[in-house]
Amino acid sequence: MLTINVTIEQMRSMVRISHTKLDDELGMLKEAYLTDLSMSGVNTIPTDDMLSLATLMLYLRWRENYNGEADRYEKAYEAAKISMSLASEYSEVPTV
């Protein structure tokens, strides 16, 4: 199962909110993001990987329709996801 090292505070910052009312939703969106990456062939996320954090930000902004620009964020997210799925550092199966 994929994991990403990101706090709820970081996710709030990604969508530029400071309240806690959306914390549960942000947590669910994070899990949906990881599932989407996994279904696209991403098998591992390196520790402290900035591309995966930037891609998560795009995903959250798409799903939350940030500034009414969901289409723009969806296209950017899909492009980043494809890049990750094609890169060897994300497709290697982690050893347990």
State what each model feature region is.
Residues 12-22, 34, 38-45:
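Structural recognition of short helix-loop-helix hairpins that underlie histone-fold modules
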Residues 1-4, 24-28:
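Short, functional N-terminal and low-complexity linear motifs
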Residues 1-15:
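Short, intrinsically disordered N-terminal pre-domain segments
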Residues 9, 37, 74-76:
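Short, functionally important structural connectors and interaction interfaces within domains
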Residues 14, 20-22, 29, 47-96:
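Short loop/turn elements at secondary-structure junctions
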